[in-house]
From Swiss-Prot:
<protein>
    <recommendedName>
        <fullName>Annexin A2</fullName>
    </recommendedName>
</protein>
<dbReference type="GO" id="GO:0016323">
    <property type="term" value="C:basolateral plasma membrane"/>
</dbReference>
<keyword id="KW-0041">Annexin</keyword>
<dbReference type="GO" id="GO:0036035">
    <property type="term" value="P:osteoclast development"/>
</dbReference>
<dbReference type="GO" id="GO:0005737">
    <property type="term" value="C:cytoplasm"/>
</dbReference>
<dbReference type="GO" id="GO:0007160">
    <property type="term" value="P:cell-matrix adhesion"/>
</dbReference>
<dbReference type="GO" id="GO:0044794">
    <property type="term" value="P:positive regulation by host of viral process"/>
</dbReference>
<dbReference type="GO" id="GO:0042383">
    <property type="term" value="C:sarcolemma"/>
</dbReference>
<feature type="repeat" description="Annexin 2">
    <location>
        <begin position="105"/>
        <end position="176"/>
    </location>
</feature>
<dbReference type="GO" id="GO:0005886">
    <property type="term" value="C:plasma membrane"/>
</dbReference>
<feature type="modified residue" description="Phosphoserine; by PKC">
    <location>
        <position position="26"/>
    </location>
</feature>
<dbReference type="GO" id="GO:0045121">
    <property type="term" value="C:membrane raft"/>
</dbReference>
<dbReference type="GO" id="GO:0031340">
    <property type="term" value="P:positive regulation of vesicle fusion"/>
</dbReference>
<dbReference type="GO" id="GO:0031902">
    <property type="term" value="C:late endosome membrane"/>
</dbReference>
<dbReference type="InterPro" id="IPR018502">
    <property type="entry name" value="Annexin_repeat"/>
</dbReference>
<dbReference type="GO" id="GO:0019834">
    <property type="term" value="F:phospholipase A2 inhibitor activity"/>
</dbReference>
<dbReference type="GO" id="GO:0002020">
    <property type="term" value="F:protease binding"/>
</dbReference>
């Protein structure tokens, strides 16, 4: 394994602990921040006849999440009303969804999206898979804590009652947030062993030893698995993604594919999800909003770069073509610029 590859691996999203999370975010803390002034301006905007949506969008999309929490606190102190409730009364449609998402902490937002994906008849497997496959240990542990706080039940219990079979086992294992962290020592012997076991458990035999796949893909560190998937190609005639498509079907196939794509290149994974949400006729606004809100302070700059590289046009351009009005304005602010 080349030194360059090892350095790049150490800089992967999960393992780069030296870089502040906001370094690749499009939304930065506002420099001359004044929570009281912002709260007053939002109060005035809500009271304006017809609602001054532009002011609300300008403020909330140009403040960090921590700053938005301060604004919400200042607003409640001023008006004796909760800001999310005021937003629900003042706004509607997709713009309301974006603004309410921005007012939640990242863990509250993910917890509420997970709950919504399992509420009522039918399960939104896509949302469930995206969130659980893409969050780090730390994020998942915080989501579990906040989920219990918000809904008085465990996330794991809800996943168990809403899913079944091997798909359920994979999600439950991932949701624990117990994956090994990236270490400084690279265990080439274990990399080779895991690659061989993934091959032996799938393509090499008749039927698939899914529990073996689950244990390796949910317990090993991201950096380790990146190397395992590379090594896997020396055993199998197919790469890991092709092997998954041959071996399993349905929700389980979808979950494994999402998981491997996240491990290989998380910003590219989100770039693909964003492209899929806007391609063709109609827009999958729920996916578009969730990614723009949840990644704006994490890795939006990397996502933009991968998007432009793969699709030839900027994410900003796609959003401009696919959305309109103040909803469009909000998403473009979260995007943080054209490429």
């Amino acid at each position: 394994m080349s030194t360059v590859h090892e350095i790049l691996c150490k800089l992967s999203l999960e393992g780069d602990h030296s870089t502040p999370p906001s370094a690749y975010g499009s939304v930065k803390p506002y420099t001359n921040f004044d929570a009281e002034r912002d709260a007053l301006n939002i109060e005035t905007a809500i009271k304006t006849k017809g609602v001054d949506e532009v002011t609300i969008v300008n403020i909330l999309t140009n403040r960090s999440n921590a700053q938005r929490q301060d604004i919400a606190f200042a607003y409640q102190r001023r008006t004796k009303k909760e800001l999310p409730s005021a937003m629900k009364s003042a706004l509607s449609g997709h713009l309301e969804t974006v603004m309410l998402g921005l007012l939640k902490t990242p863990a509250q937002y993910d917890a509420s999206e997970l709950k919504a994906s399992m509420k009522g008849l039918g399960t939104d497997e896509d949302s469930l898979i995206e969130i659980i496959c893409s969050r780090t240990n730390q994020e998942l542990q915080e989501i579990n804590r906040v989920y219990k706080e918000m809904y008085k039940t465990d996330l794991e219990k809800d996943i168990i009652s809403d899913t079944s079979g091997e798909f359920r086992k994979l999600l439950v294992a991932l949701a624990k947030g117990k994956r090994a962290e990236d270490g400084s020592v690279i265990d080439y012997e274990l990399i080779d062993q895991d690659a061989r076991e993934l091959y032996d458990a799938g393509v090499k035999r008749k039927g698939t030893d899914v529990p073996k796949w689950i244990s390796i893909m949910t317990e090993r560190s991201v950096c380790h698995l990146q190397k395992v998937f590379e090594r896997y190609k020396s055993y199998s005639p197919y790469d890991m993604l092709e092997s998954i498509r041959k071996e399993v079907k349905g929700d389980l196939e979808n979950a494994f594919l999402n998981l491997v794509q996240c491990i290989q290149n998380k910003p590219l994974y989100f770039a693909d999800r964003l492209y899929d949400s806007m391609k063709g006729k109609g827009t999958r606004d729920k996916v578009l909003i969730r990614i723009m809100v949840s990644r704006s302070e994490v890795d939006m700059l990397k996502i933009r770069s991968e998007f432009k590289r793969k699709y030839g046009k900027s994410l900003y351009y796609f959003i401009q073509q696919d959305t309109k009005g103040d909803y469009q304005k909000a998403l473009l602010y979260l995007c943080g610029g054209d490429d």
